[in-house]
């Protein structure tokens, strides 16, 4: 399906699209591991973090802060770093220090002049509140995992967004970096979606193409707001 000709509502995934969570997680792990003289390999950390977090999120719902604590302990164990569970709070405590990508705020300001905006985030309300202090532009809608009690790729975020924006659904575009978490459920729900493919990930056989694919959030902005 093509992008709507008259886009009115634009939503974003937050972490990975607006916020550089990979750097934030790596720096948090390394800072805590420094206490034990342990070195973290970022290239090993990030894929294991994604895999383990996704597994935990697929179980019974719990607040994202708890997901992070559990993920921290399991990832550390796999890396050979003996982290006691009592120290795992370092990871949710680091979320307020996860910073936006360089182009994020300039693009949000441009979007805000033309569209209504929202965030659909796999996070709890408290942690997103801390993150929003780094983001410019007013939001017309926020849907968190805490509100719908599930994590993407479960479709609850997108169903709730569609319910709230009502008649604007046909003029809604979602922008996200996560293919499994955001692109696939959008395609299933027939929501126009722009994939911010920062790592030049190649689609696997059987995976459907997004409505549009770009390399950065800035390029996504040019697609919707070329002026």
Model-predicted segments: where are they?
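Asp-based, Mg2+/Mn2+-dependent phosphohydrolase catalytic module
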Residues: 1-10, 109, 115-227
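N-terminal helical cap/lid subdomain that shapes the substrate entry/recognition surface
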Residues: 3-102, 124, 128
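Surface-exposed charge patches
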Residues: 31, 74, 106, 160, ...
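Generic recognition of short, well-ordered alpha-helical interface segments
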Residues: 66-71, 106, 156, 215
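Hydrophobic, well-structured mid-protein blocks that either form specific transmembrane helices
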Residues: 95-111, 117-120
